[in-house]
Amino acid sequence: MLSHNTMMKQRKQQATAIMKEVHGNDVDGMDLGKKVSIPRDIMLEELSHLSNRGARLFKMRQRRSDKYTFENFQYQSRAQINHSIAMQNGKVDGSNLEGGSQQAPLTPPNTPDPRSPPNPDNIAPGYSGPLKEIPPEKFNTTAVPKYYQSPWEQAISNDPELLEALYPKLFKPEGKAELPDYRSFNRVATPFGGFEKASRMVKFKVPDFELLLLTDPRFMSFVNPLSGRRSFNRTPKGWISENIPIVITTEPTDDTTVPESEDL
């Protein structure tokens, strides 16, 4: 009787034989698909679907860029022809590469020779020179619009009264009437006796004031008006005292020493 291990091996061999027949003999194992997707693959997969708005905008932009992209098919065809001719003539050979000699890269056609002086016809074909015969444009001239005059204005152009009625004007201020020349005593202060008797110079005396020193108690009272205010929070003081410091003695009141008499 076969053991359990041999039976499992036979079943595995049968399963592998069936898988080879289904997928072919070249396949060694099962294709389990992609295990990990990088962010770039995920982004390209999302842009390939047209379900979201961003993918549609990306496709429109790609089509627009392809529309305005210029591809030089003529240059590519010429390069292929030159390469095929070189292959036929035997110019391209592997022995040159083995010897260490390297060929110069093929230059595109219609490339001017850098050793020769530049020719304007090669750089820009069709350019013959500056346009000296054509006068330059006048950019600084100001275009004045044409004035339009309606038929009504043409009909009443000869009548100034109708023109004034058509275009109302602002009212002009009326001229001020001449006021009588009255003398005013309100604006100028006239001294007693007139200006002749008044002194020509106005004398001003600076008032005398006493400067207080910084150490003066009166100055300190101005700086800190609460300095002379009585405080009941820290040290108890009497009601009659004038902020006189109270001296508290620390000596004991009871005398512990007993006096001795002459008899003892």
Swiss-Prot record:
GO terms for molecular function: actin binding; FATZ binding; protein phosphatase 2B binding; telethonin binding. It comes from the Eukaryota. One of its GO terms (cellular component) is actin cytoskeleton. The modification Phosphoserine is found at S101, S116. The modification Omega-N-methylarginine is found at R53. Its main location: cytoplasm. Expressed specifically in heart and skeletal muscle. It is found in: Cytoplasm, Myofibril, Sarcomere, Z line. Residues 90-135 are annotated as: Disordered. One of its GO terms (biological process) is skeletal muscle tissue development. The modification Phosphothreonine is found at T107, T111. Residues 106-120 have a biased composition (Pro residues). Keywords: Cardiomyopathy, Cytoplasm, Disease variant, Methylation, Phosphoprotein. Signal peptide: none annotated. Interacts via its C-terminus with spectrin repeats 3 and 4 of ACTN2. Interacts with ACTN1, LDB3, MYOT and PPP3CA. Belongs to the myozenin family. It is linked to Cardiomyopathy, familial hypertrophic, 16: A hereditary heart disorder characterized by ventricular hypertrophy, which is usually asymmetric and often involves the interventricular septum. The symptoms include dyspnea, syncope, collapse, palpitations, and chest pain. They can be readily provoked by exercise. The disorder has inter- and intrafamilial variability ranging from benign to malignant forms with high risk of cardiac failure and sudden cardiac death. This is Myozenin-2. It comes from Homo sapiens.
